Every structure is written in C-alpha cells, then in structure tokens.
Amino acid sequence: MTETASETGSWRELLSRYLGTSIVLAGGVALYATNEFLTISLLPSTIADIGGSRLYAWVTTLYLVGSVVAATTVNTMLLRVGARSSYLMGLAVFGLASLVCAAAPSMQILVAGRTLQGIAGGLLAGLGYALINSTLPKSLWTRGSALVSAMWGVATLIGPATGGLFAQLGLWRWAFGVMTLLTALMAMLVPVALGAGGVGPGGETPVGSTHKVPVWSLLLMGAAALAISVAALPNYLVQTAGLLAAAALLVAVFVVVDWRIHAAVLPPSVFGSGPLKWIYLTMSVQMIAAMVDTYVPLFGQRLGHLTPVAAGFLGAALAVGWTVGEVASASLNSARVIGHVVAAAPLVMASGLALGAVTQRADAPVGIIALWALALLIIGTGIGIAWPHLTVRAMDSVADPAESSAAAAAINVVQLISGAFGAGLAGVVVNTAKGGEVAAARGLYMAFTVLAAAGVIASYQATHRDRRLPR
C-alpha cells in the first residue's frame, strides 16, 4: 500500500488549523537557534563594553553544554509534568537568562546567563521535535518536522544580521532584551496552543515522579559536550585530537549505559533490529558534514577577498539550501519516492562537497565564488530533502508507539552532539593541513566529501531495513 496525496496534509492546513501549535513548536527552536547566532555577532561589542576577552570561548562553550544536558531530559520532563508545563518552565528560564545577559555588568555574569539560556534552549528545541506526534495529526508530521527544523536555516540568516545591527548601533544589551520580549509573547501563546491539560507524549497524562531523570546519561552527554567544546580552545593539535577522542569514548559509554539502565534517553527500539539506529546515524553524518560551513566565512574572506558581511552570507547559502530542500521535500507523497530521496541524500551532499573541493583557489574571481555558493546550496539541499522524512521515520519505526516521543526527542540530542563533533573535526582537518589556506580548504571539503558519501550506507539501511514500511 502506498500513501496518497489525500493522506498527506497541506501547508495550508498546518498553518491555519494548527497555526498556534506550529508557532509554539517552531518558535522554541527559533529562539534557541537565533540566540546562538545572534550572540556570536554581539560578542565583539560586548567585550569592548564589559571586558572579559579571556572568557570569550566559554560564552558559547557552556551554552552548548547546557543545551545538550537539557536535551537529554526532554522526554522525562514530558512524562513528569506534561507539554504545557515543560514549555512554560523552559520559557521562564530562557526569559530570565536573557534578562541576566542584558543586565550583565561583567563577562562572568554573562557566561552564567548564557549557561542558563543553553539549558532552557536545549529543552525548548527538544520539545519542538518531541511534541510533533502528539500535537499534530500523522498526515502533518512531515510538514511539521520540516517547519521545526527549517528554523535553523531561518536563524542562520536572521541571527547574525540582527546581532550585527544591534552591535553596530552600540545596543548589544537591547538584543537580549528583545529575546526576553519574544519569549514572553510565546509564553502567552502556549496555554492556548497546547490546551489547559498537561499532556505527555502520545497524549497520555503525565506520570509524575514515577519516571526517573536519566542522571547517568545526562552526566555522560554533558561531559562529552564539554570535552568537544574545550577541544576548540587548545592551540595544539594533540590536545584537540585527544579531547575529541575522549568525547567519542564518552558518547560510546553513554550508548552502552543508556542501553542497560531503565531511566534512558534513547528509546529501546534503537537497540533492536529495526531502522531507528540507522536513522539516527544518517542524521549524525549529515550534521557532521554540514559543519564544513564553520570555515566558509574564513575561507571566503581569505581566498575570495570578501567582506565579513558578504562572507557571512556566503556561509548562509547552506542554510538556504537546507530550508528550500525541506519545504520542497515535505510535499512528496509516494513512500517509494521518499525512500529513494532519503537514501540518496548523503550522495547529494557529497556532490556539493566535492564541487566545493575542486573549486577552492586563491584570489578567486566572482564566478568561482558563485560556484562556492552553489556547492553550499547543494550540500544544504542534501540535508533538507531527507531531514523531515527521517524525523517522521524515527517516530514511526519504534516497536512501541509510546516510544514515539522519546524517539523524536532524541533527534535533538543527535543533532546537537553531532554538530559539535563536526565543528571539532573541521578544526582538526584545517589545522593539520599542509600547504597553506587553499590546501586546508580543499582538504576540509574532501574529508567531508568522503564522510558524506559513506553516509549512504546508513541512509540505505534507514529506508530499507524495515520491510514493513510501505513501498
């Protein structure tokens, strides 16, 4: 049996009948992602005002650590207090943390505020995925997933531009004030969009204190995130590689511990014979390979002689491709076509990365820079055409329907930790390259080309492993 167009909801239905719910689910992710990129643009002006340059890296490091730790608690929060209370608690902490950042008299206070923002933001971003299956009809899961994850692309454009504007006007504190205002407005919408009753995953009543917090999983993932983040701080390759290896080991231990304990982050179906583990692995490979974007602005300035603003918009080409790919792919109806698209997505990414590799050169003319932008668009499209369908497959491939929200919540954990690994790996590749900046740029793109191409093994398994799925 194949899916028909009538079984797939429309964008009009999602953004009219479920407008409030869509704003809440996508809004939490947008707040988290926009705040991340906005703060990076504000930091130079912030340091010029309150000092603390030695703590520069920790503003983003502890934000990431806090968000990864919080992401591991999403399903537990839903089961203990329900969807509405989880959102309101996350928004309250995020708003308070934004006020702390806005009023920070020193960098130490700002770092504390950013840590709180990361904790609240990680919860909000995870809730955006985890509640798709319980707040939207199944016919809208794909479009809901596309809308939620598209917020990363939107944030990549809006965050740096907004942060740069506030910084240029000397109003960096006001930027955090605006985040507080947006958080308050969203909090007002939550009771209306999510209803009066606290609802857990799948619509069940929260079970209160009977569901334990996954303490060991939380600690291991927090330690892994910290190791990855600190890996970016040393100026020596050996320390960086060692920290990345330690982080990989911690993630491996996390998987083993999560498999053996009752209070877990990953749904039990991950460890079964189904496709869920391959779905997560495909997403992980895509996120790691996407982190080639970390060095695009740098190489754009040094090899293409672009201005900082132009180089920033060049880097945003990947996000544009991601968003466009998601919107277009979410309209696909045939299960067979969707399976082929998802399976081929890593190869689409690899083709874009290969194009980027062969076009890197010094003193690049406009035509070559246009090819760089095209390569990034292709890379982003490779992610976008698969991501919403991978999200739906994750929710739909669990052995027990009650695991569906846990499967969706784990997507955010996979996304955050994989992105951090990708950024760290990109740094190792660039810093070990011999032969100057052109060789470093080519080496980065080539290394990630190989990684993305290898991802086709996981994507094929993700779409063909479970023969029960319609063809």
Curated annotation (Swiss-Prot):
It comes from the Bacteria. The chain crosses the membrane at residues 23-43, 55-75, 91-111, 116-136, 146-166, 174-194, 213-233, 237-257, 279-299, 308-328, 337-357, 366-386, 410-430, 438-458. Pfam families: MFS_1. It is found in: Cell membrane. One of its GO terms (biological process) is xenobiotic detoxification by transmembrane export across the plasma membrane. GO terms for molecular function: efflux transmembrane transporter activity; transmembrane transporter activity. Its main location: membrane. The keyword Cell membrane applies. SUPFAM superfamilies: MFS general substrate transporter (SSF103473). One of its GO terms (cellular component) is plasma membrane. PROSITE patterns: MFS. InterPro entries: MFS (IPR011701), MFS_dom (IPR020846), MFS_trans_sf (IPR036259). The keyword Transmembrane applies. Keywords: Antibiotic resistance, Cell membrane, Membrane, Transmembrane, Transmembrane helix, Transport. It is a multi-pass membrane protein. PANTHER family: MAJOR FACILITATOR SUPERFAMILY, MULTIDRUG-EFFLUX TRANSPORTER RV1634-RELATED. Belongs to the major facilitator superfamily. Could be involved in fluoroquinolones efflux. This is Probable multidrug-efflux transporter Rv1634.
